Amino acid sequence: MKNCKVCIVTGASRGLGRGIALVLARDEGCRVYATARNGDALKALVEEAATGTRGGTVNACVLDQSDDAAVQAFVEQVRTKESQVNLLVNSAYAGLIAIKPHFGKPFWERPLSVFDASLNIGLRSAYVMSALVAPLMVKNKAGLIVQISSFGGVNYLFDVGYGVGKAGLDRLTADMAAELNPYDVHAVTLYPGGAVTEIAAFPGGETPVFTGRAVAALLNKATKEDLARMNGKVAQTAELAVNYGFTDVSGDMPKGPFAGVDAAKQCREAMSKPLIQYDMDAELPDASATNNPDIAAMFPGA
């Protein structure tokens, strides 16, 4: 399809990235360049996306995002094939696999590599990909960049490096939006709820398809006015589901303690308050609530 929208989705071999790429191609008819290191997993994604009837496709692109030269070569390949990129979704993240063996330990008892895992393939990789894709969007004065982040950007969650990485993504979006705004290119941070993926098993959590439908809503249902309001800001999957009328694969909304409308409301309330580092009267969170050995059970695939 010549007129279909062109999307790049990183971290697409599994988890939320896979669900996002699948929905965009299979259900929305987009041409998706899906990146990951696992070529076999990408091949399976290509085959599943081909079952759709909208004419969308997934192009499997084996890519190590720690290799800047390889990322640049990938973007150049896309640039030679496409006149535009409508959407970039930065979903690649390597932190949870590194964090899992160390639940219950403070940061000074964890290997330094745990911190690097959260920031290198996550925050830094999102910056690199965005910096390389943005010129094409700026040239066309159109485009949307979505960073997949989490509530860890607002409050303590799991690990020091996890929170620093997610807070960094949120600020990355805000500052990029400020520089992109004159060119009608938008940047939005997306908070999924607790999810059920190959790695995570949050009770009552949302599926990767639900996250994919949230991204699709930003791409195809949000108006220019909607995107202008969300530009540089944090949107939540459950909020988008209410606003744009979609559900999870079950036909219902996720209803777990970490996902769904109620969880999103609690998160929004937390976001409305000053961050603890700026509020001298704020109480520090109890780190042990989400950094304990029992939490590791929520990540059986890590």
Model regions and ranges:
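C-terminal helical subdomain
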Residues: 189-190, 201-300
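Rossmann-fold cofactor-recognition segment
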Residues: 49-68
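Catalytic loop of short-chain dehydrogenase/reductase
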Residues: 94-95, 106-114, 118, 144-182, ...
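Conserved glycine-rich Rossmann-like NAD(P)H-binding loop of the short-chain dehydrogenase/reductase
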Residues: 28-45
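Active-site loop of short-chain dehydrogenase/reductase
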Residues: 4-5, 55, 83-85, 137-150, ...
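Conserved glycine-rich cofactor-binding loop
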Residues: 13-15
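A short, exposed helix-loop element centered on a Lys and neighboring polar residues
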Residues: 130-131, 174
